Amino acid sequence: VAEHSEVFNALIAAARNGKHVTVFVELKARFDEENNLATAELMRKAGIDIIFSIPGLKVHAKVALILRKNDKGERLRSYAYVSTGNFNEKTAKIYADIALYTCNKQIVDDMCTLFKVLRKEVTEPRFKRLLIARFNLLPELKALIQREIDLVKEGKPGRIILKMNALQDTAMIDELYRASEAGVQIDLIVRGICCLVPGESFSRNIRVTRIVDSFLEHARVWYFGNGGDPLVFIGSPDWMRRNLYRRIEAVTPILDGRLRRELTDMLELQLSANRKACWVDNQLRNIFKRKPGNDDVRA
């Protein structure tokens, strides 16, 4: 959270108004350790139940769970929140992020399970909708890529669009190379580190776009064509070893068709951008897209 956080103040106000509030505080937060400790102590004094980091495991997920109950303690409608960005007002002003706030029962139930994991109440969780790193994220990702490969083998188009901050994990890069060789059309929007080499014989169907503009592109959005019934996901992890193997990360599917179309339109707009965007070539150089005579597209 920010040093003077409205989120933090709202949580304290909720606790003082008789709400049961639990906050997981990740202490291993670059440059924010001291502030996180001080904030956690203030929340504890306000009656908030504080859960600190799990030793040897960083939690990078950006999630929240709201459970509404009646006077008898019976659960009413509940809500889950999954975001690509932190609860930080300072960075929220300059980072471009996406969040989902939903009452979908399966996602809410999965979120309850995730918080049980953070409380160390569950060690082998099962998730129906959420993709959680260290549990079901990697197998599901590989299955999604394989689905696109299978579609191409059936003579149908395979399509993948991935937006992230960094692409570094060699195992997942190899999965994308395998999909490219099978004929899946792949577009990547990668702001930072990109260890995938596009434009070679094994990656001829992969294009990499980089956008650097006024706001920092921080969202992680994944699109899979799925034979004309697209699957879209948002979440916290980049495709780096530390995110996929050594942290708790949370990814949610976007189940509402209108929201899926909105995110798909955003991805297509960013792929068409040429004013503040560039290609990444097979030497990993930035090649500006903007050319004289072309209409400017700023995404």
Give the residues covered by each predicted segment.
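Active-site core of PLP-dependent enzymes with the aminotransferase class I/II
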Residues: 2-9, 170-173
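PLD/PLD-like phosphodiesterase catalytic module centered on the HKD motif
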Residues: 13, 17-94, 101-108, 134-299
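Short, compositionally biased "basic patch" segments
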Residues: 106-125, 139-140
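Gly-rich Lys/Arg/Thr-decorated short loops/hinges at beta-loop-alpha junctions or inter-strand turns
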Residues: 121-130, 155-157
